[in-house]
Amino acid sequence: MDNDKIDQHSDEIEVESEEKERGKKIEIDEDRLPSRAMAIHEHIRQDGEKELERDAMALLWSAIAAGLSMGASLLAKGIFQVELEGVPGSFLLENLGYTFGFIIVIMARQQLFTENTVTAVLPVMQKPTMSNVGLLIRLWGVVLLGNILGTGIAAWAFEYMPIFNEETRDAFVKIGMDVMKNTPSEMFANAIISGWLIATMVWMFPAAGAAKIVVIILMTWLIALGDTTHIVVGSVEILYLVFNGTLHWSDFIWPFALPTLAGNICGGTFIFALMSHAQIRNDMSNKRKAEARQKAERAENIKKNYKNPA
Protein backbone atom coordinates (compact mmCIF):
# COMPACT_ATOMS: atom_id res chain seq x y z
CA MET A 1 0.00 0.00 0.00
CA ASP A 2 2.78 2.45 0.98
CA ASN A 3 4.74 1.57 -2.16
CA ASP A 4 1.68 2.43 -4.27
CA LYS A 5 1.50 5.85 -2.61
CA ILE A 6 5.16 6.48 -3.28
CA ASP A 7 4.72 5.50 -6.92
CA GLN A 8 1.70 7.77 -7.28
CA HIS A 9 3.63 10.68 -5.78
CA SER A 10 6.54 10.06 -8.15
CA ASP A 11 4.16 9.98 -11.13
CA GLU A 12 2.71 13.35 -10.11
CA ILE A 13 6.09 15.07 -10.36
CA GLU A 14 7.50 13.27 -13.38
CA VAL A 15 8.67 15.34 -16.32
CA GLU A 16 7.08 14.40 -19.63
CA SER A 17 9.63 13.61 -22.35
CA GLU A 18 9.96 11.50 -25.47
CA GLU A 19 12.64 9.38 -23.81
CA LYS A 20 10.37 8.46 -20.90
CA GLU A 21 7.56 7.61 -23.28
CA ARG A 22 9.93 5.12 -24.95
CA GLY A 23 11.30 3.91 -21.62
CA LYS A 24 14.80 5.24 -22.37
CA LYS A 25 17.26 7.64 -20.76
CA ILE A 26 18.46 10.91 -22.28
CA GLU A 27 21.47 10.24 -24.49
CA ILE A 28 24.43 12.40 -23.42
CA ASP A 29 27.27 10.50 -25.12
CA GLU A 30 28.80 12.94 -27.60
CA ASP A 31 29.88 10.11 -29.92
CA ARG A 32 26.26 9.04 -30.36
CA LEU A 33 24.91 12.55 -30.99
CA PRO A 34 25.12 14.75 -34.11
CA SER A 35 27.11 17.57 -32.44
CA ARG A 36 28.96 18.62 -29.31
CA ALA A 37 26.40 21.38 -28.78
CA MET A 38 23.63 18.81 -28.62
CA ALA A 39 25.62 16.74 -26.10
CA ILE A 40 25.89 19.81 -23.84
CA HIS A 41 22.20 20.60 -24.35
CA GLU A 42 21.15 17.06 -23.45
CA HIS A 43 23.43 16.98 -20.39
CA ILE A 44 21.85 20.19 -19.07
CA ARG A 45 18.35 18.95 -19.97
CA GLN A 46 19.01 15.79 -17.94
CA ASP A 47 19.99 17.93 -14.94
CA GLY A 48 16.91 20.05 -15.52
CA GLU A 49 14.59 17.04 -15.39
CA LYS A 50 16.10 16.00 -12.06
CA GLU A 51 15.53 19.48 -10.62
CA LEU A 52 11.94 19.64 -11.87
CA GLU A 53 11.15 16.28 -10.24
CA ARG A 54 12.66 17.06 -6.82
CA ASP A 55 10.49 17.23 -3.72
CA ALA A 56 9.24 20.76 -2.97
CA MET A 57 10.56 20.81 0.61
CA ALA A 58 13.99 19.61 -0.53
CA LEU A 59 14.02 22.44 -3.08
CA LEU A 60 12.93 24.99 -0.48
CA TRP A 61 15.59 24.10 2.09
CA SER A 62 18.29 24.00 -0.58
CA ALA A 63 17.14 27.41 -1.86
CA ILE A 64 17.18 28.90 1.66
CA ALA A 65 20.72 27.58 2.10
CA ALA A 66 21.66 29.19 -1.21
CA GLY A 67 20.21 32.52 -0.10
CA LEU A 68 22.25 32.38 3.10
CA SER A 69 25.37 31.43 1.14
CA MET A 70 24.92 34.37 -1.23
CA GLY A 71 25.42 36.60 1.78
CA ALA A 72 29.11 35.74 1.37
CA SER A 73 29.19 37.94 -1.74
CA LEU A 74 28.16 41.06 0.21
CA LEU A 75 30.37 40.03 3.12
CA ALA A 76 33.51 39.59 1.01
CA LYS A 77 32.93 42.65 -1.15
CA GLY A 78 32.30 44.84 1.90
CA ILE A 79 35.40 43.64 3.75
CA PHE A 80 37.58 43.99 0.63
CA GLN A 81 36.28 47.53 0.11
CA VAL A 82 37.33 48.54 3.62
CA GLU A 83 40.66 46.73 3.76
CA LEU A 84 41.78 47.64 0.23
CA GLU A 85 40.91 51.33 0.40
CA GLY A 86 43.57 53.34 -1.42
CA VAL A 87 45.24 50.26 -2.93
CA PRO A 88 45.86 50.50 -6.72
CA GLY A 89 43.46 48.24 -8.60
CA SER A 90 41.22 47.90 -5.56
CA PHE A 91 38.09 48.05 -7.77
CA LEU A 92 39.07 44.78 -9.44
CA LEU A 93 39.88 43.07 -6.14
CA GLU A 94 36.76 44.34 -4.37
CA ASN A 95 34.55 42.90 -7.08
CA LEU A 96 36.35 39.57 -6.84
CA GLY A 97 34.58 39.27 -3.48
CA TYR A 98 31.27 39.14 -5.38
CA THR A 99 32.22 35.67 -6.66
CA PHE A 100 32.40 34.06 -3.20
CA GLY A 101 28.68 33.45 -2.78
CA PHE A 102 28.37 31.93 -6.25
CA ILE A 103 31.31 29.60 -5.62
CA ILE A 104 29.72 28.31 -2.40
CA VAL A 105 26.23 27.91 -3.89
CA ILE A 106 27.22 26.22 -7.14
CA MET A 107 29.96 23.96 -5.78
CA ALA A 108 27.65 22.89 -2.92
CA ARG A 109 24.85 22.19 -5.47
CA GLN A 110 22.41 24.51 -3.72
CA GLN A 111 19.35 25.86 -5.53
CA LEU A 112 19.97 29.25 -7.17
CA PHE A 113 17.05 30.81 -9.04
CA THR A 114 19.07 32.20 -11.94
CA GLU A 115 20.66 28.82 -12.67
CA ASN A 116 17.17 27.44 -13.17
CA THR A 117 16.32 30.03 -15.82
CA VAL A 118 18.18 27.78 -18.27
CA THR A 119 18.67 24.34 -16.64
CA ALA A 120 15.02 23.69 -15.82
CA VAL A 121 13.73 25.42 -18.94
CA LEU A 122 15.31 23.07 -21.51
CA PRO A 123 13.06 20.08 -20.63
CA VAL A 124 10.03 22.35 -21.07
CA MET A 125 11.26 23.62 -24.43
CA GLN A 126 11.87 20.05 -25.51
CA LYS A 127 8.28 19.07 -24.65
CA PRO A 128 6.16 22.15 -23.81
CA THR A 129 3.17 20.43 -22.19
CA MET A 130 0.98 22.00 -19.50
CA SER A 131 2.34 19.48 -17.00
CA ASN A 132 5.95 20.47 -17.69
CA VAL A 133 5.12 24.18 -17.59
CA GLY A 134 3.42 23.60 -14.23
CA LEU A 135 6.53 21.85 -12.89
CA LEU A 136 8.68 24.78 -14.06
CA ILE A 137 6.44 27.35 -12.35
CA ARG A 138 6.48 25.21 -9.19
CA LEU A 139 10.29 25.03 -9.23
CA TRP A 140 10.74 28.74 -9.91
CA GLY A 141 8.27 29.72 -7.20
CA VAL A 142 9.75 27.48 -4.50
CA VAL A 143 13.38 28.34 -5.31
CA LEU A 144 12.76 32.09 -5.56
CA LEU A 145 10.90 32.05 -2.23
CA GLY A 146 13.71 30.09 -0.58
CA ASN A 147 16.41 32.34 -2.02
CA ILE A 148 14.66 35.51 -0.79
CA LEU A 149 14.11 34.00 2.67
CA GLY A 150 17.77 33.00 2.87
CA THR A 151 19.04 36.39 1.75
CA GLY A 152 16.70 38.06 4.24
CA ILE A 153 18.11 35.98 7.09
CA ALA A 154 21.67 36.80 6.01
CA ALA A 155 20.92 40.53 5.74
CA TRP A 156 19.20 40.54 9.16
CA ALA A 157 22.19 38.78 10.74
CA PHE A 158 24.66 41.24 9.19
CA GLU A 159 22.70 44.17 10.64
CA TYR A 160 21.65 42.95 14.08
CA MET A 161 24.38 40.53 15.18
CA PRO A 162 27.55 42.11 16.65
CA ILE A 163 29.85 40.82 13.92
CA PHE A 164 31.15 43.78 11.90
CA ASN A 165 32.74 47.13 12.73
CA GLU A 166 31.21 50.43 11.60
CA GLU A 167 33.50 50.74 8.57
CA THR A 168 32.32 47.40 7.21
CA ARG A 169 28.67 48.24 7.89
CA ASP A 170 29.12 51.54 6.04
CA ALA A 171 30.61 49.60 3.13
CA PHE A 172 27.51 47.35 3.06
CA VAL A 173 25.32 50.46 2.89
CA LYS A 174 27.40 51.96 0.08
CA ILE A 175 27.21 48.73 -1.94
CA GLY A 176 23.44 48.62 -1.59
CA MET A 177 22.96 52.31 -2.40
CA ASP A 178 25.07 51.92 -5.55
CA VAL A 179 22.51 49.36 -6.74
CA MET A 180 19.60 51.67 -5.88
CA LYS A 181 21.03 54.46 -8.05
CA ASN A 182 19.66 52.55 -11.05
CA THR A 183 16.25 53.42 -12.46
CA PRO A 184 13.75 50.54 -12.94
CA SER A 185 14.61 50.38 -16.66
CA GLU A 186 18.33 50.25 -15.83
CA MET A 187 17.66 47.50 -13.26
CA PHE A 188 15.87 45.52 -15.97
CA ALA A 189 18.52 46.06 -18.65
CA ASN A 190 21.42 45.23 -16.32
CA ALA A 191 19.60 42.12 -15.11
CA ILE A 192 19.26 40.87 -18.68
CA ILE A 193 23.06 40.91 -18.95
CA SER A 194 23.59 39.09 -15.65
CA GLY A 195 20.89 36.53 -16.50
CA TRP A 196 22.54 35.88 -19.85
CA LEU A 197 26.00 35.54 -18.26
CA ILE A 198 24.72 33.09 -15.62
CA ALA A 199 23.05 31.02 -18.35
CA THR A 200 26.29 31.08 -20.36
CA MET A 201 28.16 29.87 -17.29
CA VAL A 202 25.73 26.97 -16.83
CA TRP A 203 26.14 26.05 -20.51
CA MET A 204 29.93 25.91 -20.05
CA PHE A 205 29.83 23.58 -17.02
CA PRO A 206 29.59 20.21 -18.85
CA ALA A 207 32.77 20.97 -20.79
CA ALA A 208 34.59 22.68 -17.90
CA GLY A 209 35.42 19.55 -15.90
CA ALA A 210 37.90 20.31 -13.11
CA ALA A 211 38.03 23.96 -14.24
CA LYS A 212 34.42 24.55 -13.15
CA ILE A 213 35.43 26.82 -10.28
CA VAL A 214 37.49 28.96 -12.68
CA VAL A 215 34.43 29.37 -14.92
CA ILE A 216 32.35 30.43 -11.90
CA ILE A 217 34.93 33.02 -10.81
CA LEU A 218 35.42 34.52 -14.28
CA MET A 219 31.74 34.77 -15.21
CA THR A 220 30.48 36.11 -11.86
CA TRP A 221 33.44 38.49 -11.56
CA LEU A 222 32.43 39.89 -14.94
CA ILE A 223 28.87 40.36 -13.62
CA ALA A 224 30.27 42.38 -10.71
CA LEU A 225 32.66 44.44 -12.82
CA GLY A 226 29.80 45.40 -15.13
CA ASP A 227 27.68 46.63 -12.20
CA THR A 228 24.82 44.44 -13.41
CA THR A 229 21.90 43.51 -11.16
CA HIS A 230 21.14 40.01 -9.86
CA ILE A 231 17.95 39.12 -8.03
CA VAL A 232 19.59 36.96 -5.34
CA VAL A 233 22.83 38.82 -4.59
CA GLY A 234 20.98 42.11 -4.88
CA SER A 235 18.37 40.90 -2.38
CA VAL A 236 21.05 40.60 0.30
CA GLU A 237 22.33 44.09 -0.50
CA ILE A 238 18.91 45.78 -0.59
CA LEU A 239 17.40 43.89 2.35
CA TYR A 240 20.39 45.00 4.44
CA LEU A 241 19.34 48.60 3.70
CA VAL A 242 15.76 47.73 4.66
CA PHE A 243 16.80 46.22 8.00
CA ASN A 244 19.04 49.13 8.95
CA GLY A 245 16.29 51.63 8.15
CA THR A 246 17.85 53.23 5.08
CA LEU A 247 15.06 51.99 2.77
CA HIS A 248 11.40 51.07 3.13
CA TRP A 249 10.18 47.55 2.31
CA SER A 250 8.38 48.88 -0.76
CA ASP A 251 11.73 50.00 -2.21
CA PHE A 252 12.84 46.37 -2.24
CA ILE A 253 9.86 45.38 -4.41
CA TRP A 254 10.12 48.44 -6.67
CA PRO A 255 12.40 49.66 -8.18
CA PHE A 256 14.63 46.67 -7.37
CA ALA A 257 13.06 43.20 -7.23
CA LEU A 258 10.42 43.19 -9.98
CA PRO A 259 12.54 44.75 -12.78
CA THR A 260 15.59 42.69 -11.78
CA LEU A 261 13.64 39.43 -11.64
CA ALA A 262 12.09 40.13 -15.04
CA GLY A 263 15.50 40.97 -16.52
CA ASN A 264 17.18 37.85 -15.13
CA ILE A 265 14.41 35.65 -16.55
CA CYS A 266 14.54 37.45 -19.88
CA GLY A 267 18.33 37.12 -20.15
CA GLY A 268 18.50 33.52 -18.99
CA THR A 269 15.36 32.06 -20.55
CA PHE A 270 14.02 34.13 -23.42
CA ILE A 271 17.43 34.98 -24.86
CA PHE A 272 19.98 32.33 -23.94
CA ALA A 273 17.85 29.21 -23.47
CA LEU A 274 15.77 29.87 -26.59
CA MET A 275 18.86 30.51 -28.71
CA SER A 276 20.68 27.48 -27.30
CA HIS A 277 17.66 25.27 -27.92
CA ALA A 278 17.16 26.67 -31.42
CA GLN A 279 20.71 25.84 -32.49
CA ILE A 280 20.25 22.12 -31.84
CA ARG A 281 16.69 21.69 -33.13
CA ASN A 282 17.93 20.50 -36.51
CA ASP A 283 20.35 18.16 -34.75
CA MET A 284 17.41 16.70 -32.84
CA SER A 285 15.45 16.27 -36.06
CA ASN A 286 18.42 14.55 -37.72
CA LYS A 287 18.85 12.32 -34.67
CA ARG A 288 15.21 11.23 -34.82
CA LYS A 289 15.51 10.58 -38.56
CA ALA A 290 18.62 8.47 -37.96
CA GLU A 291 16.85 6.50 -35.23
CA ALA A 292 13.84 5.89 -37.50
CA ARG A 293 16.15 4.79 -40.32
CA GLN A 294 18.02 2.39 -38.02
CA LYS A 295 14.72 1.00 -36.73
CA ALA A 296 13.48 0.45 -40.29
CA GLU A 297 16.74 -1.24 -41.26
CA ARG A 298 16.56 -3.56 -38.26
CA ALA A 299 12.97 -4.45 -39.12
CA GLU A 300 13.98 -5.12 -42.73
CA ASN A 301 16.86 -7.34 -41.61
CA ILE A 302 14.56 -9.30 -39.30
CA LYS A 303 12.09 -9.72 -42.16
CA LYS A 304 14.84 -10.96 -44.51
CA ASN A 305 16.16 -13.38 -41.91
CA TYR A 306 12.63 -14.70 -41.36
CA LYS A 307 12.13 -15.28 -45.10
CA ASN A 308 15.60 -16.76 -45.60
CA PRO A 309 16.41 -18.76 -42.48
CA ALA A 310 19.96 -20.16 -42.31
Swiss-Prot record:
List the InterPro entries hit by this protein, alphabetically: Aquaporin-like, For/NO2_transpt
Is this entry keyworded Membrane? yes
What is the topology of this protein in the membrane according to its UniProt annotation?
A: Multi-pass membrane protein
Give me the Periplasmic side stretches, as residue ranges. Answer: 82-90, 157-186, 233-251
Instruction: Cite the GO molecular-function annotations of the record.
Output: formate transmembrane transporter activity
Q: Where is this region: Disordered?
A: 1-27, 291-310
Gene Ontology cellular component terms for the protein in this record: plasma membrane
Cite the record's Basic and acidic residues compositional bias ranges.
Answer: 1-12, 291-303
Looking at the record's lineage, which domain of life comes first?
Bacteria
**Residue intervals passing through the bilayer:** 59-81, 91-113, 134-156, 187-206, 213-232, 252-274
Q: Where in the cell is it found?
A: Cell inner membrane
List the Pfam families hit by this protein, alphabetically: Form_Nir_trans
Keywords assigned by UniProt, alphabetized: Cell inner membrane, Cell membrane, Membrane, Transmembrane, Transmembrane helix
Major place of localization? Answer: membrane
Which GO BP terms, alphabetically?
A: formate transport
Q: List the stretches on the Cytoplasmic face of the membrane.
A: 1-58, 114-133, 207-212, 275-310
**PANTHER family (UniProt xref):** FORMATE TRANSPORTER-RELATED (PTHR30520), INNER MEMBRANE PROTEIN YFDC (PTHR30520:SF2)
**Protein name, UniProt field:** Inner membrane protein YfdC
The record lists the organism as Escherichia coli (strain K12)
